[in-house]
Amino acid sequence: MELKEKYHLQSIFALSRAEDIWAAIETILYSSGRKLHFKKRGDLPEIRAKQSTRGLVIDSSQSGLIVKYGKVTIPCKYKAKDLWLWDEEKAILAYLAEPELQDAHAVDQMSKGIITDTYRPCFASLVCKKIRGRLRVYVHITVEGKAISKRRKDSTPRHYYGKGNIGCDIGTQTIAYTSNTEVGLENLAERGNSIQHVERQEALILRAMERSRRAMNPNHYNENGTVKKGHKQWNFSKRYQKLRQRHQELCRIATENRALAIREQVNHLRSLGDCFITEPPNAKKLQKRANPENPVDKNGRMKRKKRFGRSIKNRCPGYLQAKAKQLFESTGGMYVEVPILYRASQYDHTSDSYIPKKLSQRMYHLADGTKVQRDWYSSYLLYCINKTYTQINKLKCRSNFATMYQKEKNMIEEIIRSGKKIMNSGIRTV
């Protein structure tokens, strides 16, 4: 009663939020989580009801889908050019027109061993976002079944799916891949010069915010410039608040660009094959700061604890790996993570031996003198996996190497010719 009378909320919203809280507690009790993360002051809310008939009710009208919250009716609008959303709305409306018939058909097909997509709306969420200074509210509808394939205006598929193995070596900033038809070495999450431009702009804004914060709160700092300990009441000027809004908008645009770039890369990889082979993800481990046993070097200076946090934040290799797994498994493909003993970065097929290499050694020579790029060669060894997906197929390595090596040389020549800088690749373009 208190929830309804004091906050004007139904119990279904509390139930939905309780599930999120319990999921977070489970990560602390039974997984690698360490602490709970609460909403910050100023964060926009997300309203979700885990039932489509309570709280946020999903219904149909003459104009299309609508979401009802009490006496408030929210029409679902989208751009007319978005054919995928049009197809999705059409499928949801078809279910809402005859839900009993659609459910009976799905149960009948399941008894025959066939799983069909009903497009039943499960629940809805209202997500608030601030875009270019304006508050926008989006309706997220969770639908039962697989998403409809995207198409063009002439009804042809927007994305095509290939066949065959794709060996991918995913680094902190780059991705190297080898398939039956193409080899490649690219920067992760890059759309033009977006990352370099955003980094520069973000540094300038943060520097200006720091100057403003120090000018408005001079008593909060020691003589050496460090912040005093203890609880403090901070004063922020109007200029600081405007800079903070600019910084939030810049981070939002950078996030969107990273997500779009990664989805484009994953869709391209899916067009090359249907079996994605890679190593287990380790971005979370590389993101943490180093903790050396002896923190002091031989000269008496403190060792640096910096690792790959900034690169992983800008390039998001873990997000690419998660999206690849989701796309390949949902479109009839396979996602394979090789065992730790596979050691694609150490094997040399010309001498049939494992040779450890320094992390800084990006270009190296095989035992027979052939010069290869390290990341691409690792992706080639992942491509040459056996039928049980556990070990390297040495016969396949030897028989296909000449063809793939020529493609690798053509790829490096194209990178040098275009002048594109591939991070940590060892390829000099100037």
Predicted region positions:
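Acidic carboxylate diad motif detector
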Residues: 1-131, 310, 314
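Residues at beta-strand starts and edge strands
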Residues: 120-122, 133-137, 164
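Positively charged, helix-rich recognition surfaces that bind polyanionic ligands
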Residues: 137-430
